[in-house]
């Protein structure tokens, strides 16, 4: 983790963010590594990339669906902290400021699960 954070400190200020995937990628990394202020700022840019035409190309290129997919990944794998250990889904939530809870469903190894997060506590239940 220290190596990742050192690389972030060195290279994040140098990023041009000229790709529509840049903001979401940075949000995901920051959220997974506890950099919540930066995660929130990058998340908002990624979330509103098309709605506010942040890159100035939504009209020419249409919606940036890959960015929207990575926004979803930031919510689920970043803020909710969904990961898999010992053959089971686990949560390590750290929600952004202003967000008090989160619920979502997902499939893992052919089984359906529901994740419920309130504050810093989360549970994963198998849905039958």
Region locations from a protein language model:
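C-terminal beta-sandwich/jelly-roll accessory domains of carbohydrate-active enzymes
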Residues: 121-128
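Alpha-solenoid helical repeat scaffolds
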Residues: 8-12, 44
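C-terminal capping/lid segments that line or modulate ligand- or cofactor-binding pockets
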Residues: 1-2, 17-101, 105-108, 112-114, ...
């Amino acid at each position: 983790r220290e190596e990742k954070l050192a690389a972030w400190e060195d290279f994040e200020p140098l990023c041009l963010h000229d790709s529509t995937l840049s903001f979401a990628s940075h949000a995901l990394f920051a959220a997974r590594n506890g950099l919540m202020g930066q995660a929130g700022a990058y998340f908002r840019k990624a979330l509103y990339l098309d709605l506010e035409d942040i890159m100035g190309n939504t009209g020419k290129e249409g919606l940036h669906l890959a960015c929207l997919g990575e926004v979803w990944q930031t919510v689920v794998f970043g803020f909710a902290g969904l990961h898999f250990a010992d053959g089971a889904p686990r949560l390590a939530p750290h929600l952004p400021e202003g967000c008090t809870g989160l619920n979502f469903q997902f499939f893992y190894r052919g089984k359906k699960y529901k994740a419920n997060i309130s504050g810093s506590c989360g549970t994963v239940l198998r849905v039958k």
